[in-house]
Design a protein with these regions (language model features):
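Extracellular carbohydrate-recognition regions
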Residues: 18-45, 107-117, 121-123
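Short carbohydrate-recognition loop motifs
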Residues: 45-59
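Extracellular/luminal beta-rich ligand-recognition
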Residues: 107-149
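Terminal, low-complexity interaction segments
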Residues: 137-213
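Short coil-to-beta strand junction motifs in C2/discoidin
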Residues: 91-100, 197-202
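Bacterial Sec-dependent N-terminal signal peptides
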Residues: 1-24
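Extended, low-complexity, turn-rich repeat/linker tracts enriched in Gly/Pro/Ser/Thr and Asp/Glu
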Residues: 84-95, 119-121, 189-193
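Short beta-strands within extracellular/lumenal beta-sheet-rich domains
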Residues: 58-79, 96-98, 162-170, 203
């Protein structure tokens, strides 16, 4: 019996240790926007935040980055910095949900909400969906944030934590010759005289890699 078990273990070891290895990884796009380069981007605008160029600020807006003639690949990794500026309130009504989306080739990969509301420990606070997709009311404001100590840009410009920074990284199967990367919001701001001042968003340091297995 012991010999049979040992033989089975020896037989299984190669299969248990098998995993996909990265054959090659090619950066097909990288942009920190310091040169104000918007090549291949539709709807892009250059702004300044915290002493640096960013793409934004957007409010009820979007941009689409389109790349063609990609090298052969099996996976794509997209990474970027997302700045949520000013008075985002997550899923708090009446002007919620404050939805933000990321789409790849027209399909949603992120559909979530963000909140910059202050939430003291022990309090029940209006939630945001991130780092999960909407609807999800299990996360306090600024959950999953990389930085929470950045100033606002307009309606919360006097607040030292009026902007929240998120580092977003997504890897997904992809083998096509081209790719479109889109970010947008679905903010309800009809009751505000200056919607962009009330809440906006921007991105920076976009990097896209094509990975071959």
């Amino acid at each position: 019996m012991k010999k049979k078990i040992l033989s089975l273990i020896v037989f299984l070891i190669p299969f248990l240790s098998c995993k996909q290895h990265v054959h090659s990884e090619v950066v097909i796009y990288n942009n920190d926007f310091e040169s104000s380069d918007l090549t291949n981007i539709t709807g892009g605008i250059i702004g300044q935040f915290n002493g640096s160029n960013v793409m934004g600020q957007f409010s009820n807006g979007d941009f689409v980055l389109s790349l063609n003639n990609l090298p052969a690949h099996d996976l794509i990794t997209v990474s970027f910095d997302l700045y949520i500026h000013d008075n985002w309130r997550g899923e708090l009504l009446p002007d919620g949900p404050a939805i933000w989306e990321m789409l790849i080739d027209g399909g949603p990969y992120i559909n979530t909400t963000f909140s910059n509301l202050d939430c003291k420990e022990g309090n029940i606070c209006p939630p945001q969906s991130y780092p999960d997709n909407y609807p999800n009311n299990n996360h306090n404001p600024r959950s999953g944030a990389y930085r929470t100590d950045l100033p606002g840009v307009c309606s919360m410009k006097t607040s030292p934590n009026g902007t929240t920074m998120y580092k977003i990284t997504k890897t997904f199967k992809h083998a096509g010759n081209s790719i479109s990367f889109e970010c947008l919001d679905k903010l309800d701001q009809k009751d505000y005289p200056d919607p962009k001042c009330e809440k906006s968003w921007s991105v920076d340091n976009i990097s896209i890699k094509a990975i071959s297995l």
